[in-house]
């Protein structure tokens, strides 16, 4: 049985369709004082999968998730698997300053305490967050789904570019699937007050060096896990355009996209902005339903 929270109802419906499983309806609403009402409509199976992202508004979506998990256990579910495509607070995985809350740890404890028996997510920003759980966890990569989308849209070998070294493993993963070249951008200090972002020379799969000259005339795809304000992406788009890329498309798993990020990315020269549906956005063109269904089948 699949149950979708209000943040992930469409995704839950597609997962249920992939698995040919029952989809249980959840009624949610707010009382006049702002408190949340939740009711599960239907008989509950022994094993239930809840799908609910906890992006903006994070606190509301998290509370709904906790209500769902606890309610399902009260209603007789023996096992509750929790799929959180995007986990809010996951970037607050450590104490940066004295007195700060380690919010990711608190959220993990809340999910477990509510009664979750298993936790599944996608491309969590800091993998150490999974260590906060004492229940089985799975961190699915969405790069296969993104690679499939890219492959269907173009008829030539693209160049996959990570906007920084941290995102390079994502670019490598997609490039391996598509059998194409990849590289990343890096900031090079030229003097006390001068920093320049450049393409990093890397050895390609054909033993040829991927460098600045490799960009000219290519369809470039920038790959990252999360785009929030988009500053790094805007910079990457501009650089690739300057280097002569035929087109620049931007892809990510989690489209947070705050402070006008989408508009600024397009203004920089991006051909398109593509993301998964871990969060609901205009860019959400890559479905995670098959990836979730494959894990649930195991």
UniProtKB/Swiss-Prot annotation:
Coiled coil, from the record: none
UniProt KW Cytoplasm keyword: yes
Co-factor binding details: Binds 2 Mg(2+) ions per subunit.
Protein residues bound to Mg(2+) 2: 164
Any single Gene Ontology cellular-component annotation: cytoplasm
Binding site for ATP: 33-35, 91-92
Binding of Mg(2+) 1, residues: 125
Gene Ontology MF, one: magnesium ion binding
Name of the gene: prs
Alphabetical list of Gene3D superfamilies matching this protein: 3.40.50.2020
Top-level class of the enzyme under EC nomenclature: transferase
Protein name, per record: Ribose-phosphate pyrophosphokinase
Species, as recorded: Methanobrevibacter smithii (strain ATCC 35061 / DSM 861 / OCM 144 / PS)
Family classification: Belongs to the ribose-phosphate pyrophosphokinase family. Class III (archaeal) subfamily.
Residues engaged in binding D-ribose 5-phosphate: 189, 224
Record-linked Pfam families: Pribosyltran (PF00156), Pribosyltran_N (PF13793)
Cofactor requirement: Mg(2+)
Catalytic reaction(s) noted: D-ribose 5-phosphate + ATP = 5-phospho-alpha-D-ribose 1-diphosphate + AMP + H(+)
């Amino acid at each position: 049985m699949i149950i979708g929270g209000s943040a992930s109802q469409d995704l839950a419906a597609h997962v249920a369709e992939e698995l040919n499983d029952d989809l249980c309806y959840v009624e949610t609403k707010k009382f006049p004082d702002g408190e949340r009402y939740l009711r599960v409509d239907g008989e509950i199976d022994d094993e239930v999968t809840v799908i609910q992202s906890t992006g903006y508004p994070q606190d509301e979506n998290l509370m709904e998730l906790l209500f769902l998990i606890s309610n399902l256990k009260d209603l007789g579910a023996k096992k509750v698997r929790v799929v959180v495509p995007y986990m809010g607070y996951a970037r607050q995985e450590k104490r940066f300053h004295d007195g700060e809350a380690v919010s990711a740890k608190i959220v993990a404890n809340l999910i477990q305490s509510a009664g979750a028996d298993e936790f599944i997510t996608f491309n969590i920003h800091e993998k150490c967050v999974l260590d906060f759980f004492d229940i089985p966890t799975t961190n699915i990569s969405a790069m296969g789904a993104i690679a499939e989308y890219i492959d269907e849209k173009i008829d030539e070998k693209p160049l996959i570019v990570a906007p920084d070294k941290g995102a390079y493993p994502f670019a490598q993963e997609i490039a391996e699937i598509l059998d194409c070249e990849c590289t990343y951008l890096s900031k090079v200090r030229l003097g006390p007050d001068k920093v320049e972002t450049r393409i990093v020379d890397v050895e390609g799969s054909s033993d040829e060096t991927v460098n600045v000259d490799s960009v000219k005339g290519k369809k470039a795809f920038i790959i990252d896990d999360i785009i929030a304000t988009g500053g790094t992406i805007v910079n990457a788009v501009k650089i690739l355009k300057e280097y002569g890329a035929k087109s620049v498309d931007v892809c990510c798993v989690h489209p947070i996209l705050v402070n006008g990020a989408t508009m600024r990315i397009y203004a920089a020269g991006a051909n398109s902005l593509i993301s998964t549906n871990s969060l609901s956005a205009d860019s959400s063109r890559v479905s995670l339903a098959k990836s979730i269904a494959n894990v649930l089948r195991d």
